[in-house]
């Protein structure tokens, strides 16, 4: 008998997604259609009703936040068993696999994962040593090209870029370092060159769930495909109408490719929206239907709503747009009973926030900017991490050069050399 408390609030399509356990499943989940609840309920169902061991389940998420949220919600449902379910971002999963198997690729298991700031410093050293003109090829442009090449968004590097790439990879290997793209590329290489290692992880992860498939790039998709080849118990969830990470190499085509790679896959669509009103959804459906690469679907809601739910205001200049939004906020707060924290302003890129900030300061509108600067990217935090890494391994010259003048000690370039 099923203990169905966690299933009773699911709609028919969600329930089908939860109970279809064996074989490949592709779920097209529109915005606000209960995707996360369906994923959680499916894992609970697998453990409670199908007696699948939690350590045979791998759930791949796109962000650390999603990973933490999934684990917290699972703990409420299955308590201690939740800690045995593998829940991880693809980068974290690959890092753990490489820590255990790095020697097969001639890396040490204590390899260091570097970020973009470290990459710039390393390229600066390479440029200086090889007398490369940064006006011809800036380090940041080189980093982007190298990343695109590694995640297969770029097929070939030529000329100066190829030279820089080769020297960069040599430096990383000699210093036992990997960048974020290496975590993926080297895991894929490890699996292709060592079938026994691949089979070990295939046997460990017999049931694989993938969240936000539309945000995966080519290498990520290929790794997932290798892992699920033996048992084909792959459950992929995504929304082809919500792909926003193409600048990071994400391929919305992966959702369509899934159907080609798994021709027997069951296709399920979650289309009942629990967030918005039907009026808002009609507006969004009218816009989204023009997308060329998508699975046909139309979201609906049992909340009817009114015509005032959607307002379109055309502005010819950004000053007019900012003025209109500022006035709307003041009207909502002063005359309609809203609070400032009830309101969100969403813009296309970070550079546009400056115009709104100036207007909000002038009108004394309190605001917070979200996602502008990560804690670990702050200079002072990076400095402390470099101190700790250099203490742990004095051979790491990159970290030594960062901290030698923090605080200022008046040590010049010639002295450092």
What label would you give each PLM region?
Residues 27, 33-39, 263-266, 271-366, ...:
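Helicase P-loop NTPase motor core
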Residues 36-45, 70-71, 220, 325:
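Motif I (Walker A/P-loop) of helicase-class P-loop NTPases
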Residues 353-359, 365, 378, 385-417:
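Conserved helicase C-terminal RecA-like lobe
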């Amino acid at each position: 008998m099923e203990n169905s408390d966690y299933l009773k609030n699911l709609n028919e399509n969600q329930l089908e997604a939860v109970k279809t356990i064996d074989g490949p499943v592709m779920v097209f989940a529109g915005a606000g259609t209960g995707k996360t609840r369906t994923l959680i309920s499916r894992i609970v169902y697998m453990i409670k009703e199908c007696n699948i061991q939690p350590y045979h389940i791998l759930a791949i998420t796109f962000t650390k936040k999603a990973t933490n949220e999934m684990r917290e919600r699972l703990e409420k449902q299955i308590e201690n068993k939740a800690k045995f379910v593998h829940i991880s971002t693809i980068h974290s999963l690959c890092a753990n696999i490489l820590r255990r198997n790095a020697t097969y690729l001639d890396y040490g298991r204590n390899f260091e994962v570097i970020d973009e700031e470290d990459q710039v410093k390393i390229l600066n050293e390479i440029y200086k040593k090889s007398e490369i003109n940064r006006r011809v090829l800036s380090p940041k442009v080189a980093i982007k090209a190298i990343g695109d090449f590694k995640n297969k968004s770029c097929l070939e590097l030529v000329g100066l870029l190829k030279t820089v790439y080769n020297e960069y990879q040599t430096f990383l290997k000699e210093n036992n370092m990997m960048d974020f793209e290496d975590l993926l590329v080297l895991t894929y290489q490890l699996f292709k060159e060592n079938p026994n290692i691949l089979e070990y992880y295939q046997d460990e992860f017999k049931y694989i769930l993938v969240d936000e498939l539309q945000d995966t790039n080519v290498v990520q998709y290929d790794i997932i495909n290798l892992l699920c080849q033996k048992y084909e118990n792959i459950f992929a969830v995504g929304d082809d109408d919500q792909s926003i990470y193409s600048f990071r190499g994400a391929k919305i085509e992966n959702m369509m490719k899934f159907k080609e790679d798994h021709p027997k896959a069951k296709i399920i669509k979650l289309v009942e929206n629990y967030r918005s009103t039907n009026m808002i959804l009609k507006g969004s459906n009218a816009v989204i239907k023009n997308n060329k690469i998508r699975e046909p679907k139309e979201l609906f809601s049992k909340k009817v709503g009114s015509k005032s739910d959607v307002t379109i205001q055309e502005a010819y200049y950004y000053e007019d747009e900012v003025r209109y939004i500022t006035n709307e906020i003041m009207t909502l707060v002063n005359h309609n009973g809203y609070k400032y924290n009830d309101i969100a302003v969403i813009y296309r890129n970070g550079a546009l926030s400056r115009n709104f900030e100036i207007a909000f300061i002038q009108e004394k509108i309190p605001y917070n900017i979200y996602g502008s600067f990560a804690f670990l990217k702050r200079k002072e935090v990076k400095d402390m991490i470099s101190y700790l890494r250099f203490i742990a391994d004095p051979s790491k010259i990159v970290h030594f050069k960062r901290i030698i003048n923090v605080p200022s000690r008046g040590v010049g370039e010639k002295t450092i050399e």
